[in-house]
């Protein structure tokens, strides 16, 4: 799928501590390959200048409208600004970007490993493997027991 620039509107942006989960309404549904990402910005002005890369956690939608979800960690000024946005706030997104993960066609068992906020790329892979009825195990790591949020 070819990347495109879209304007979105935040449906929810909730978090606890340094991890946040953001759901965004976009004009049309996007298909993505697990491992792809978006460049996201939503603050006024040019400071910071560059949008922030966020892994696509999930996408959905119907009837010409779409949604895209991100799980992100506040690590600097840009993600701190994103964490302060609320439902209804506008965003600018370029997506989907990157090649994503490739899955060999042969039958095998998979170990999916993610650490910290990197877990957000593991779950789209698990969903793809589940659709193929593949065997897999998920291993998540974090610096503390409470610092790796489990998705709903």
PLM segments and residue spans:
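FNR/FR-type flavoprotein reductase catalytic core
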Residues: 77-152
